[in-house]
Swiss-Prot record:
It comes from Methanothermobacter thermautotrophicus (strain ATCC 29096 / DSM 1053 / JCM 10044 / NBRC 100330 / Delta H). Belongs to the UPF0215 family. Pfam families: DUF99. InterPro entries: Endo_dU. This is UPF0215 protein MTH_1316.
Length: 204
């Protein structure tokens, strides 16, 4: 079930150079009280990097949705963007993004992309164990709606707000050009880890 309350964006034709903002977080110290860097890369499809945006969120905090909204709405790229793509629903540990609110307040559809099907019950147990406000965090996760499998170079899993799953899947496939994940997310990961560690490591 998709909880998005507005009409989904109607993509009559998805162009190969659709402007995508891909967001990933940098490496961080788990369960710390530090801020973690978020990097957003503006891509034309999966081919050309047009810009880089940054913000920070608190590790295991509750500010990810608001900080991403501020980053997007304050960007000179806003009018060219057609979709936001996130590497997972959480950043900096369990700082959960409410993708319905993100879509509503930016006016852009949101696609969450992960490599493996999330174990929702395990996530819920972890939230209950660690956070007094676990119910609010869990509501944001539930609002992301149904998980859909996408056949690309390798299978990926997506959740969406403000966009039909079939359109989201096509955008994922269009932007997956050089590895098994969409290029905007791959580039965001490389930049975020490189800036934080001095050299990029791992994969998104």
């Amino acid at each position: 079930m998709n909880y998005f309350s507005m009409e989904n964006h109607n993509f009559r034709q998805i162009k190969s150079e659709i402007r995508i903002l891909g967001i990933d977080d940098a490496p961080f110290t788990p369960r710390s009280e530090e801020d973690v860097l978020l990097v957003g890369t503006v891509f034309r499809g999966g081919q050309w990097l047009d810009g880089v945006l940054t913000t920070t969120v608190r590790v295991d905090g509750d500010d990810a949705t608001e900080r991403i909204i501020e980053m997007v709405n304050g960007s000179r790229h806003l009018n060219q963007l057609r979709v936001i793509m996130l590497d997972g629903l959480t950043f900096g540990g369990f700082n959960v993004v409410d993708i319905v609110e993100l879509s509503e307040r930016t006016g852009l559809p949101v696609i969450v992309v992960v490599r493996k099907h999330p174990d929702m019950e395990r996530i819920k147990r972890a939230l209950k164990h660690r956070f007094s406000d676990w119910k609010a965090r869990w509501r944001s996760i539930e609002r992301a709606g149904r998980i859909h499998r996408v056949e690309s170079r390798e299978p990926l899993y997506i959740q969406t707000a403000g966009i039909e799953p079939d359109d989201a899947a096509e955008i994922v496939r269009i932007s997956t050009t050089r590895s098994s994940i969409p290029e905007p997310l791959r580039a965001a990961h490389i930049i975020a880890s490189g800036v934080t560690l001095g050299e990029s490591r791992g994969s998104a």
